[in-house]
Amino acid sequence: MAKVQGKGAAEKENDDGLREKMIAVNRVSKVVKGGRTMSFAALTVVGDGDGRIGMGKGKAREVPVSVQKAMEQARRGMFKVALKNGTLHHTVVGKHGASTVLISPAAEGTGVIAGGPMRAIFEVMGVRNVVAKSLGSSNPYNMVRATLNGLRASLTPSEVAAKRGKTVEEILG
């Protein structure tokens, strides 16, 4: 069973300006001839507070080492999400496995209305106003992947206009 971090999730800000958050730590075991070998699997997210986000998972015999591996992987896999005044441009749906997440932009002052791992993602990437709903599986790994898939699918009005061969004014009405 994963130990999911709630409101008191371990968040650190490094000297490189990146925010790190640990989402879950799982104790896993491998059965070998001499018995069981215990190790720990960690799931983390890293963001810059300005729309860049990355997810990492690491596994090691000790918790700190697995968390460090996960943070390094998250830093290597960061990508940029276009934000508009601390929220998204439009509603997106993300899916991974049995998890589906619905992420909607929100008006200024709404705050981050999201549960579990989704809240950690929005906090480290600098989203201030968003409403997100998790549907299906609540497995932390699947929820994080579904959220990131949804964020990757979000487009700016200029990207939508370029895709349709129109101007931004025509798209926005």
UniProtKB/Swiss-Prot annotation:
Pfam families, A to Z: Ribosomal_S5, Ribosomal_S5_C
Domain of life: Bacteria
GO CC list: small ribosomal subunit
SUPFAM superfamilies: dsRNA-binding domain-like, Ribosomal protein S5 domain 2-like
PROSITE patterns with a match to the protein in the record: RIBOSOMAL_S5, S5_DSRBD
Domain S5 DRBM: residue ranges: 18-81
Bilayer-crossing regions: none
BP term (GO), one: translation
Statement: the UniProt record of this protein carries the keyword rRNA-binding: yes
Signal peptide residues on this chain, from the entry's feature table: none
Family: Belongs to the universal ribosomal protein uS5 family.
SUBUNIT field: Part of the 30S ribosomal subunit. Contacts proteins S4 and S8.
Protein name in UniProt: Small ribosomal subunit protein uS5
Organism from which the protein derives: Bordetella petrii (strain ATCC BAA-461 / DSM 12804 / CCUG 43448)
Biological classification of the source: Bacteria, Pseudomonadati, Pseudomonadota, Betaproteobacteria, Burkholderiales
